[in-house]
Amino acid sequence: MNSIGVYIHIPFCRRKCPYCDFYSINYSAGKADIYTEKVCSSIRYFGESIRRNADTLYFGGGTPGIIGADRLCKMVNEIKENFGFSENPEITVEVNPEKENIDFDKMRKNGINRISIGLQSANDSELKILGRLHNVKQAELCIDRAKSAGFQNISLDLMTSTPTQTKYSLEKSIEFCAKKDVQHISAYILKIEQGTPYYNIRETLDICDEDEQAEMYLFTVEKLKEYGYHQYEISNFCKSGYESKHNLKYWHDEEYIGIGTSAHSFVNGKRFYFPRSFEDFYNLKTVSDGEGGSPEEFIMLALRLSEGLTEKRYKNRFGESIPEVYKNNAAKFSKLGFLEINSDGIRLMPKGFLVSNYIISEILG
C-alpha cells in the first residue's frame, strides 16, 4: 500500500498574531506535556489502524518550535515506531525566530530534516505592525543556527501587501531571503479574516487595494525568479528539487492523516477532522467531512500548481484523459492570458493565480 503523509498540529503560541485565524492557545509547559502524551497515544492508535509507512511528517501550528526539541523528537520517534518511515522521509518543523534556545542539533540528530521559519518580513517596523515577537537580527540568527546544525532544507515565510509595506521594502525582504541562501520561500498575500483583531480595525489599516495587491504579487514572482526560485504553486517557490513534499500531497490530492486539534485528514477516500477542542481530540472524536478524491477535487487542487492539471496525472488517477468539457471551459481564459492549454494539460499563469478561485469554478462549471 502507498505511503501516507502525517500532519501534527501543535496549537501553542506565545502570543496570537493579529492577522491569524489558525487555532492556537497560549503556551504552558504543563499543557504541552499533556498534549504531547495525547498526540503520542493518537499516533499509536492511527498507526495500528492505518498500517502505512509515513513518507512525510509535518509539525504545523500554532508554533511547533515553542514546545521544544524533546517533545517534538518524542513524537517523531512514536511515528517511527508505530507507522515506520519510508526511505528518505521529509520531516518538517515550523519555528518562529524569537525563541533563541531552539535545539536544532537535537532535532537534526532525531531525523528532522526541514525547518520552516516564520520570517514574514525583513523590516523591523513591519514586523512590529504584524504583531511579531522577533526582529530581523533574531531571524538571521535563527537561520544561521539551523544551518550550523546541518539543516540543508530551510523555508522562510513572507507576507505581501501588509500594512505600510512598499514595493521597496518587499524587495528588501526578498533580497534578505535570497542572500541567506535558503532553499524554499512561501509568499502569502495578507488576507484580513473575520474574527481576527485585524478584521476589527480593518478600516484603519494602511493596506493595498486589490490592484496594488496584484502588482505586489506579480513583483514577488518576478523577483524570486531572478534569484533562482521557481514558482511551483500559487504561494510557494523553491530552488530545484526543494519543493515541499508534504504540501505536494495536498495539491496532488494524495492521502494524509492529521493528528491534533483542528487537524484534517484524507484517508481511504474519506475526509474527516478534529474540532478546535482539546476534549474532542483527547477522546479521538472526529467529524466526517465527506468523500474525497473526486475528479472535480483533483482538478481544483492541481490547478494551484504551476505544472497545472496534467494529462499524465489525471490519466494515472482516473484512467482517462481530461474531459473536453473542462478544456472548453478553460479556453476563454487562455485567450485572455490567464492560463495555457496544450497537449500536456491546463495550467494557470501567474496573473491567473490571482483570480484562481474564479477561474477554477468556471472551468468546473
Regions found by a protein language model. Give the residues of each.
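N-terminal [4Fe-4S]-dependent radical SAM core
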Residues: M1-Y7, F22, I50-R52
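C-terminal scaffold of the Radical SAM
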Residues: S3, S24-F46, D55-E320
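Alpha/beta-hydrolase
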Residues: I8-I10, L119
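Local cysteine-cluster metal-coordination motifs and their immediate loop/turn environment
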Residues: P11-F22
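Short amphipathic alpha-helical interaction segments
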Residues: G319-K332
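A short, conserved structural fragment
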Residues: S334-D344
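Minor-groove-contacting beta-hairpin "wing" of winged helix-turn-helix DNA-binding domains
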Residues: G345-M349
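Short, amphipathic alpha-helical interaction segments positioned at domain boundaries
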Residues: K351-G365
